[in-house]
A protein has these predicted regions:
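An acidic/histidine-cluster motif and surrounding catalytic segment
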Residues: 1-100, 104-218
Length: 218
């Protein structure tokens, strides 16, 4: 892969998290990407009109009935942070990038070898490959097995994934973002090819502790 980006805020907490990331097995492979601090964001500014919306239909996603709620400032900042990284991938013509949030701090000891192998053996049409994620049981039936990979329709968490230049280009042209970033990415799955491998190689802090591999069910 060409780049390993870590989304981290320019705050005291962000600095501590970035330092923790530098102390992982990834070390100096990482490039910090300054995230958007949602609390300082003026979402009403005209430049965001066609880029992001605060309201999202939580009900249709959760239980199949319309129920509009507002995204929090943190969720809005997270969405724009990921969008900005995708834009960077396209602008800099990066072939393959890994995108990490700064709380993805636990790694399989063979992380680099596993990820290299995943990239080499991935379906040719991949746009996104999830590395750290959760698949709610209700969505497992929608997955399509392709060799050692599964084509994903719905997932939770976006703290660790690979993205191709083609995939990033697709996403930046699908705005406005009108849901939390993991939900919104999932909603693009009809036209964005999202895959997962049978391995989970990163864990989100406080979500899972020592998981190194998963079975065919989550």
């Amino acid at each position: 892969m060409n780049k390993l980006f870590v989304i981290s805020l320019d705050t005291d907490t962000g600095a501590k998290k970035w330092k923790s990331m530098q102390n992982t097995i990834l070390g100096n492979r990482l490039t910090k990407f300054t995230g958007v601090y949602g609390k300082l964001l003026n979402i009403e500014h005209p430049k965001y009109n066609n880029l992001i919306k605060r309201d999202w239909d939580y009900g249709s996603w959760k239980y199949g009935r319309r129920d509009i709620v507002e995204m929090s400032d943190s969720e809005l900042g997270c969405c724009l942070s990921h969008f900005n990284v995708w834009n960077k991938v396209v602008e800099d013509d990066i072939d393959v990038a890994m995108i990490l949030e700064d709380d993805a701090i636990r790694y399989n000891k063979k992380f680099i070898d596993i990820t290299d192998d995943i990239i080499k053996t991935a379906p040719k049409n991949w746009d996104i490959i999830l590395l750290g994620f959760m698949i709610p049981n209700r969505y497992l039936k929608d997955e399509i097995k392709v060799g050692d990979f599964y084509k994903v329709k719905e997932f939770v968490l976006a703290h660790s994934y690979l993205i191709s230049n083609k995939g990033a280009n697709k996403l930046i042209h699908k705005t406005p973002i009108n849901a939390p970033i993991d939900t919104w990415m999932s909603l693009q799955s009809p036209t964005v090819n999202i895959y997962r491998h049978n391995y989970i190689v990163t864990n989100k802090n406080l979500i899972q502790s020592n998981l190194v591999a998963q079975s065919d069910t989550v």
